[in-house]
Regions:
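Single conserved hydrophobic/aromatic residue that forms the stacking wall/gate
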Residues: 1-12
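Alpha-helix C-terminal capping/helix-to-coil transition sites in glycosyltransferase folds
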Residues: 7, 84-86, 112
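Glycine-rich phosphate/diphosphate-binding loops that line cofactor/substrate pockets in enzymes
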Residues: 13-24, 82-84
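NAD(P)-binding Rossmann-fold cofactor-contacting core
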Residues: 25, 33-71
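Short glycine-/small-residue-rich Rossmann-like dinucleotide-binding loops
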Residues: 30, 92-97, 120-121
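Short glycine-rich, flexible loops that bind phosphorylated cofactors or substrates
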Residues: 33, 96-101, 124-125
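Short acidic low-complexity segments
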Residues: 73-86
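ADP-ribose/adenylate-binding Rossmann-like module
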Residues: 107-137
Length: 137
């Protein structure tokens, strides 16, 4: 959904931050939670749209094989350990991996002043640091 990418760009503008070269962790790329099916998923389009804006996108999904995503959509998946020092975290699909296993670690991936975008309003915003921002649809 290009609107989501533009929305993130608008949030950045209001904060006086440039999206160019910002590190954005995009988490959960499949069609729905806890499955490996990418058919009908808008996530690859969102990742590619953010890249067009000049963002450094660190895509992660525990259910997708890296090779398949590269071949199909031209997106390289990153390891969970690479999700650090992020200017923004964009959770598109809240897999249990993020909600349960990495719930607390997820908020620590953000820099001070970072933006946490929770598309499906699945996370407890009170877990964010005081200078981090929360945004959801």
């Amino acid at each position: 959904d290009p609107e989501l990418s533009r929305g993130l760009g608008d949030v950045y503008k209001r904060q006086g931050i440039s999206i160019v070269d910002s590190r954005i962790g995009v988490l959960g790329l499949t069609f729905k939670e806890n499955v490996s099916d990418l058919r009908n998923s808008q996530s690859p389009m969102i990742v590619n749209e953010l890249k067009k804006y000049g963002a450094k996108v660190l895509a992660h999904d525990p259910y997708i094989s890296d090779q398949g995503l590269l071949e199909t959509h031209g997106i390289e998946l990153t390891d969970w350990q690479d999700q650090k020092d992020l200017d923004a975290v964009l959770v598109l699909v809240p897999h249990d991996f993020y909600l349960k296993e990495k719930r607390l670690a997820l908020f620590k991936t953000l820099k001070a002043g970072g933006i946490f975008i929770d598309v499906k309003s699945a996370f407890d915003r009170t877990l964010l640091g005081g200078n981090q921002q929360y945004w959801s649809l």
